[in-house]
């Protein structure tokens, strides 16, 4: 096995038993692939597949004018280059986007000619606004903030059959319904009512009998009946009535007379119920006719109109019930044949017939008018309007589209074999749906499960962006159609016709304010990756929290391997927001697929297939952990399998597929929880959610007990610097890494240098700190894909969210009562949980009516001390340490002119104009904040003079630009001269550069020449002269290219900033705030075991073991049994073993043991006790020593979910580390030195500090803002509000009889406006009395009562 650069430095001991059949796929693929497909940027325009952006244009163009004399056609599009790179966009607060230019063709037809001859063609490129680009990490930068577009899970287009589960009608009767959902267009619903008539609704409006829709489609009553029913034929001859017998139709009926065969033998006696046995006998006897009494036909419904044979008069319309009167009429008219509908109560109900009876319409026009009235109530219907409306509803491609996916689902559901077809509905489609619905009501067929993942699909970024784009284009289409008629007369060009604003606005609105465009959760790498892999059922066209029931939220069997059953938020969104499983992907239709290994006749192959939930249903799927022998044959007599969405057992030869990996069930976050299989699901849910809230600590510390997924997350999240091409590290410092690319990785014309600029102390969306640290040294050889730099929360290329803490499970002095956590002071001293938070504070100078607001250090009425951290421009220095209330940016605002008092006039006369004209509106440090200024950015409007600070920042940026370019040129030049040196060495010179003819070139000769003189050499061989010329030209070209780059970047830096209207200048100050852990901060493990720090004890007081090693954290053992998250105990034991082994290695290194001894011990650790074997033989002695040095703090272990370490392996590891196999040890109280009465579980657990810090939550108020209406103080820290003294607290004071305290609470401390003002004044004067008055809420109550029309007044005595 080949190890990467970082893996060689620290190998994780892996306990997995199952081989890796398939690597975890790239975790951001769902976002990147979808948007790449949307833009189709790399494709050649002529050959673009009709998808996404191209499809949106194709669906709207060509646009033809109302007269038909002009048309605008779409030819193709191209994307420009972005104006700024991602970092600059974040800094400047602009959108990372590219201009979209569309080539359109305007065709003008000759009005005079009859066959539409083309008169004129104009082709032009039109600017269609900007399209945001996705960064390589799957995010968008919109107005300077990183956002993620969350994928949406919605109901797939197609047709669905369902029932109301008996909830609608009091009798509990099941009412069946069918719904045709298009991709875009009107929904069509069919539903039964309690009386078993079928109704139709369009777009959930008022219901109409379904027969109205059938009539509108052009079906007559007779055609409808023929479509849905078979008929019974009766022959009348005189007084006799005989039925053409189809024996099966008699099933279940009671015989009204004896039924004989031809011989007269009675087959069924009168009054007996006809059974299947009787039917068999009738069929054998070949009875074709059955004489029945005249009453037999009563109550039946006619299938065809009954016509008088002589006069042609219609005696009864079709769908008429046979009555005695009608029967007499028929007999009189000597009608010889009647056809009635065959219906029964078991499997052929009279539903459509009953519906026709309640239908008031009789022909197509009436039906169309009825539908028009329902859709447009109040408008007078005309024939044309009614027809147009109806055709536009379901039969117009512009207004209605099932989409290829919807058509496929539709055809499959109604039993057709072909899966392709038109995007609009046909008459046959609607009839087929009604037939299927009636069949289901008759007991044939089953309803659909709408929560099945075969009926729900995922809409990704690309698709949603395309839909928004199409919306914009449709708006453009309307405007263009109107202008097209003028195109010919006024000689307009395409550019004059198209206004791109609606498109740009639609795209901007989607990316800026759609419910699914979310502010990226950037707490740590895991939260970023999880946010991008999220699937939401909310959003436009989705569910709403209030309406979603239990079924939608619940885990469904089809979630297996597609959606994580564990990771979902707690609270109102539970089950509506899900996470993709680790191996899941979407197929071309947007359904989630999961990978499986193919199994043939009990033998497992390595072939992998991806299947959607529908395709998988018929397969028999074994679990990844099914037992196999060396020949990959399943060896159990019965294998645990999934089949038809049920869990069962089957013989090995029946198995057709097998899971790829045990962790394919869960999401990325859940697969990071070691021993997940031992945790209760509720706690695992909390664990996977809380990992996303972990704040990156000052020094990242890899988990001693992990799952092996840590490396994947760190690599795929994009937070680490990953090698793009192999090569050698040329230079490295804290801010960048320069790599000389290996020759075999460079293609002609490509750069030979890769420069990686590292991100230093940057603010994330959640105000945590982003900082990258290099892992490589100069001269190191690195391969493509190696990790070269860590970021916050990664350690040597592995995700590291928290710290490994030595913990003890014991109750101790009540400090860990109710999940509290007791910490040792050592944790604070060693800065284990110290985090850096970066806050951005912004000062905006606007233009005012009274004059511009100015950023200056000349602030009125402020002492020198307050200004000593500001420069002459009035902006704080970088590096200044500031506290609450300190001025960061001095700003003054002009005051309005008021009448001056004599005193003010005198002051003016003495001190001049300026002093009193302005008021201080400086940017100050908010309360409760203390930190260091780490960066200042100044943005100035074009045309406004830059201040000294802005010029200094600009100069600094201009000095930085050439560094990378010069570095690149140096390496390119050096590599070129190296190649020339090897080519020229030993060759003969013809002259030039001061060398004599015939001189043989050596290294000394070349060293004596300047670089420029090399190219003056004339060589004896022409090929070498040519090579020298090419090399010279190459260096000149590179220099020119780099100079052009420099000029571009210089222009970007020097140009003014694009600021909002009225804004002259913006100053952004970045404060770094260091937060140590303190009581009140929230901490958690990875198993949902969360708690608040209650006390930080001195190290000497903490419990310690016999060697005197104190524990860092004391947790309450009572938090484990009831929560059932036993995984934390196993993690603690294995963590102890990992640390013990590390200490053992450390002792060996201190004793300076030989590499061979270390190799033996490491082989014992990695290869003796279960799990994956590591090939340490390929390591050199130096590499073994480097590995051992990195393992001193503990040997990291990986215990993958559902395939982790067993109890015996943990014991073996503890034994190898010379530790008690129980994992428990005797502890002593640090304060009394007394031994605790029983051994205590001690070990190492990975603890996280969550982003719920007491500093952010603590808040105090004396006076502040008040609510406008009630005049009561506002609530919450953001509004600087007060604490609510609620009704229960009032009851408490009433119960105590504390009358004065109560009066104070309800008046002067709340909403007695005059009283509180007076009291404040009194306190200032040192007088502590209060005079309570009338509370404002009483006035509000009076106003409320008056608003009800009741006059109420307070009488004053």
Curated annotation (Swiss-Prot):
EC number: 2.7.7.6
Record field: catalytic activity: RNA(n) + a ribonucleoside 5'-triphosphate = RNA(n+1) + diphosphate
One CC-aspect GO term: DNA-directed RNA polymerase complex
GO terms of biological process kind: DNA-templated transcription
GO MF annotations, alphabetized: DNA binding; DNA-directed RNA polymerase activity; ribonucleoside binding
Class of enzymatic activity (EC top level): transferase
Pfam families in alphabetical order: RNA_pol_Rpb2_1, RNA_pol_Rpb2_2, RNA_pol_Rpb2_3, RNA_pol_Rpb2_45, RNA_pol_Rpb2_6, RNA_pol_Rpb2_7
Superkingdom of the source species: Bacteria
This protein's UniProt keywords: DNA-directed RNA polymerase, Nucleotidyltransferase, Transcription, Transferase
Database matches in HAMAP family: RNApol_bact_RpoB (MF_01321)
PANTHER family named among the record's database cross-references: DNA-DIRECTED RNA POLYMERASE I SUBUNIT 2
Function: DNA-dependent RNA polymerase catalyzes the transcription of DNA into RNA using the four ribonucleoside triphosphates as substrates.
UniProt record similarity statement: Belongs to the RNA polymerase beta chain family.
Subunit architecture: The RNAP catalytic core consists of 2 alpha, 1 beta, 1 beta' and 1 omega subunit. When a sigma factor is associated with the core the holoenzyme is formed, which can initiate transcription.
Name under which the protein is recorded: DNA-directed RNA polymerase subunit beta
Organism: Pseudomonas putida
